[in-house]
UniProtKB/Swiss-Prot annotation:
It comes from the Archaea. The gene is mfnF. This is (4-{4-[2-(gamma-L-glutamylamino)ethyl]phenoxymethyl}furan-2-yl)methanamine synthase. It comes from Methanococcus vannielii. Keywords: Transferase. Its EC number is 2.5.1.131. Pfam families: Hydantoinase_A. The keyword Transferase applies. The lineage of its organism: Archaea, Methanobacteriati, Methanobacteriota, Methanomada group, Methanococci.
Amino acid sequence: AEFVSQNIDKNCILVDMGSTTTDIIPIVDGKAASNKTDLERLMNNELLYVGSLRTPLSFLSNKIMFKDTITNVSSEYFAITGDISLVLDKITEMDYSCDTPDGKPADKRNSLIRISKVLCSDLNQISADESINIAIEYYKILIDLILENVKKVSEKYGLKNIVITGLGEEILKDALSELTKSNEFNIISIKERYGKDVSLATPSFSVSILLKNELNAKLNRS
């Protein structure tokens, strides 16, 4: 947050979507205004336990629309957000760095199979296109959840500039695209400004830059 306030915007929301969680950090007058504990952050829309890889699909919803029918889903650990992220081209196979639920490769074919299992099925019973449609249904739920929480933080602090970073940047762009339609909000991408490697390791990059600036300041004073 300190790096963002010093180098990008002193009044904004930093949204960092990793593999497991999404952090929503309000920055006001150059200082992080977020709550201190995870419990408080969960209670105040500043922490979401949804990420771009590890979140079980059954956590997002216990029913989805399938063939124009509201359909119950299995609560077993069959598929995760990494599967829908990969199938919908929000991440690459290399980005899918966690273990898969079934221990099989992190490729699109196996992701489609894992997604079909959420409906206690397989690609013999439903088609690949239908499995993609399941992924789309879950993706809509995922981005709506992110948008809902970011909007609440925005309304609470009156912040309109949003800095996005992390493995889930492409997901965040989709989630927050509705906000940019009004021209009131401005989305700033760390990946577009500093590159993908920095977006994937923003905390480490930020610390290194802050330490460098501090060292330069000391040298200038000496």
